[in-house]
Structure formats: structure tokens, C-alpha cells
């Protein structure tokens, strides 16, 4: 059943499903919530990537019930080390270490495999009786009094709001005429899961190299998820190598500090780019997740940034609905945009700056950044501020990210 109160979400990935579940909890069953995405019919082959879910976003997943499905498979990140070196350097001195919890017994992040997370969100959406449609939003007509949404299966839905959660190449954003500002890094992130002889003890490592960062992120068991950045051409060469040649490239970067290593799946390369939408809203339209922004993975904040959108938009919608306000009207959506766009721009600036500072061969820049890392390492109060910032717990934090229900 649909009505003028319906909220339609175009896109059934992490952000779209999380928003749907949060809205169901906050609005109850009287508001129809529809998620439309062809991928709901059959998920593609299991995503080989894993994601660092920061503490604030883990709290969101706990509130909406999705954390139970991944908790046993999630690996807490207990500490992190950062080095700055060239590929040929014999040693990699540690310039910065992070450790400790954001609250007693609460690590600042957990590593979760993407396949496990999407499965848990899908189960929660089904349990919440979200109207899941395995088809795309093909067009819509927004008016001052509502929005008419057409789906690929011929269904026409009357509603109050359409949410674009359809990824970086968002058709809904394009249909709204919302332009983006950004650029291609001419870099790719190589992703592969490795097994190793010794336990990582929950330690994440980020090695800054001239071509880009090489990150080793702990998974359950004696496994780690590697994300390493190379130029587009070099990444294509590396992923095309045979097993033995790839192992040599891997060992040269990873080292043997955890004993012998072995790739557990085929490496894949994902192109890296940056953009932010000029507006996060249109007439009866809100953009979330990759439809609104894509940033460099150097800080591991991409998905977390989208989940912050989810928490803010859900709170804005639920608060408006409880006051009897039309959730799709302009001033409601403006509140969401004011809340999220500055934080997104700030994170984009930070990741772009880090990528520039660390993905180069300048001796002067290397000296300056190493001095900076060393100073931060010797300033515990500053490190604590950075940890809380990275964990999503600083600034104007939405209720869901504080672990509170709507």
C-alpha cells in the first residue's frame, strides 16, 4: 500500500537499507517505506572488500538491530600504527600510534566484511516488513504537494519524499540536475584478503608510500584485508600478475612480521575519485551516501560518512513527522543539508590533503609530514581528539550515532 505519506528510497545498499530500517523504527508501520533496487533480486558475487565501521556507526547498527548479525564476525581494531617509507626502504619506522577505546570496552572501530553486513541489513529490512522492490526508480515528478515515483516494473507510487541512495553514478541525482564537484585521482585501490602465520592482535597498519597508502586491516582469525593504492596503470599491471609474481609484490609491501603470507582471494582494483554534490537536496529529494559524495579511502571514512547521512536524515524526518510537518517540504530537507554538507566538505578536504601530502616523492614534504606525525604522537590529548573525530563522536552527533533510539 502506498499513500501521500510514503517515503521511497532508490537504492538498496548499505545506506538505503539502514535508512529504511531506521525510519521504520522511528515512524512505525503507518508510514509506507519502499526500497527500490534491481540488486535486491539477486546480489552479485560476494564483495571482497571489508570496511572499518567506526564506533558511532556501530552504535547506529546496534540501535536498528543489524549489529547482531555481524558481531561474531567483526574484528575490533585495538590499535593502529602509521609509517612513512619508500618501497625499497629496509625498515619502516613508526611515526604515529593510536590505541585505546572511545569508551570502556568500546574500540574506536571494527572491521566488518561487506558481504556479512549487507546480508544482515537485508534480513533486518525483511523482518521490519520494509517494502523491498527488485526494480529501479525510472522517473519521478516532484510537486509542492507531493511526488509521483515510477518504477521499472510499471508501478506508480505517490509519496512525500524520494531518497537517492543509488550510488556514485546516481541516476536520481542526474535526473534532478544536481551537479558534482570533484576529480579523478588516477589511482586505484587494490583489494585482497590475506592469511598469515601469526596473529595480528587487532592491529591495523597504514604504510604511507610514494604511490599511495598501503593499509593492512585486521579480520577475524589470522587474516587481514589489504587496501593498497597505486597509479591506475600500475594497479592494472599488478592485479594481472600470476600468483607467484603477485605474491612477490605483496611480500615486498606487507613484509614478514606476521610470518608467511598468502592471498586468499583474487586481487581486484577499484578506481579512486572524489566528488561532492553541489546540493544534497532537490524538490522532495534527498541524497545520501555515495549519491552525495565519494572520498579517498585513505582515512577509511567513506561508508561511515554515508551512515552519518542516514542518521541525520532519519532524525530530521522523524522529528518533522512527529510535529505533523510534511517530511518532504523544503525547510525540512534544508535542515538535513545544513547538518551534513559542511562535515562532508571538511572530510573531503582532509582526505584530499592527506593524499597529496603522502602520495608523492618530495623530500621536503616527507620531512615535514614525519615531523608532524611525530609531534602528534607525543601529544596524547591531541591524539584523543583525533580518535574521537575518527570514531564519529565529535561535533553535532545525531541520536542514532550516540546509540539512542529515534
Which stretches of residues belong to each language-model region?
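C-terminal helical "tail/cap" subdomain of flavin- and related membrane-associated enzymes
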Residues: 315-406
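Glycine-rich FAD pyrophosphate-binding loop
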Residues: 24-49
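N-terminal Rossmann-fold NAD(P) dinucleotide-binding loop
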Residues: 16
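Conserved FAD-binding catalytic core of PHBH/FMO-like flavoproteins
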Residues: 61, 148, 156, 161-267
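N-terminal FAD cofactor-binding segment of flavoenzymes
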Residues: 46-87
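Conserved N-terminal helical subregion
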Residues: 2-3, 73-175, 183-188, 243
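FAD/FMN-dependent oxidoreductases across multiple families
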Residues: 236-331
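Beta1/beta-strand and adjacent pyrophosphate-binding region of the FAD-binding site
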Residues: 2-13
Amino acid at each position: 500500500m502506498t499513500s501521500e505519506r510514503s517515503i521511497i528510497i532508490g537504492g538498496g545498499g548499505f545506506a538505503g537499507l539502514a535508512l529504511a530500517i531506521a525510519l521504520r523504527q522511528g515512524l512505525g508501520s503507518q508510514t509506507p517505506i519502499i526500497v527500490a533496487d534491481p540488486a535486491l533480486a539477486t546480489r552479485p558475487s560476494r564483495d571482497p572488500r571489508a570496511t572499518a565501521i567506526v564506533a558511532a556507526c556501530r552504535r547506529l547498527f546496534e540501535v536498528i538491530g543489524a549489529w547482531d548479525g555481524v558481531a561474531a564476525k567483526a574484528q575490533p581494531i585495538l590499535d593502529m600504527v602509521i609509517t612513512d617509507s619508500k618501497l625499497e626502504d629496509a625498515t619502516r619506522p613508526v611515526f604515529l600510534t593510536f590505541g585505546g577505546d572511545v569508551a570502556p570496552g568500546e574500540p574506536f572501530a571494527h572491521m566488518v566484511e561487506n558481504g556479512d553486513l549487507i546480508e544482515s541489513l537485508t534480513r533486518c529490512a525483511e523482518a521490519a516488513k520494509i517494502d523491498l522492490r527488485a526494480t529501479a526508480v525510472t522517473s519521478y515528478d516532484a510537486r509542492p504537494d507531493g511526488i509521483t515515483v515510477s518504477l521499472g516494473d510499471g508501478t506508480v507510487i505517490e509519496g512525500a519524499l524520494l531518497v537517492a541512495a543509488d550510488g556514485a553514478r546516481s541516476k536520481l541525482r542526474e535526473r534532478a540536475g544536481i551537479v558534482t564537484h570533484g576529480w579523478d585521482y588516477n589511482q586505484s585501490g587494490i583489494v585482497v584478503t590475506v592469511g598469515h602465520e601469526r596473529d595480528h592482535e587487532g592491529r591495523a597498519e597504514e604504510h604511507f608510500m610514494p604511490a599511495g597508502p598501503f593499509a593492512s586491516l585486521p579480520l577475524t582469525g589470522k587474516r587481514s584485508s589489504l587496501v593498497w593504492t597505486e597509479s591506475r596503470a600500475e594497479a592494472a599491471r599488478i592485479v594481472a600478475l600470476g600468483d607467484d609474481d603477485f605474491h612477490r609484490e605483496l611480500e615486498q609491501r606487507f613484509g614478514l612480521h606476521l610470518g608467511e603470507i598468502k592471498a586468499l582471494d583474487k586481487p581486484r582494483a577499484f578506481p579512486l575519485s572524489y566528488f561532492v554534490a553541489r546540493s544534497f537536496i532537490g524538490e522532495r529529494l534527498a541524497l545520501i551516501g555515495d549519491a552525495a559524495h565519494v572520498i579517498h579511502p585513505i582515512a577509511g571514512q567513506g561508508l561511515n560518512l554515508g551512515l552519518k547521512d542516514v542518521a541525520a536524515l532519519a532524525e530530521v524526518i522523524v522529528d518533522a513527522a512527529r510535529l505533523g510537518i510534511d517530511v518532504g517540504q523544503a525547510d525540512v530537507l534544508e535542515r538535513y543539508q545544513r547538518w551534513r554538507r559542511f562535515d562532508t566538505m571538511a572530510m573531503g578536504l582532509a582526505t584530499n590533503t592527506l593524499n597529496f601530502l603522502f602520495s608523492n616523492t618530495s623530500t621536503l614534504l616527507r620531512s615535514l609530514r614525519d615531523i608532524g606525525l611525530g609531534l602528534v604522537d607525543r601529544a596524547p590529548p591531541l591524539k584523543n581528539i583525533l580518535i574521537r573525530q575518527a570514531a564519529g563522536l565529535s561535533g553535532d552527533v545525531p541520536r542514532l550515532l550516540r546509540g539512542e533510539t529515534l
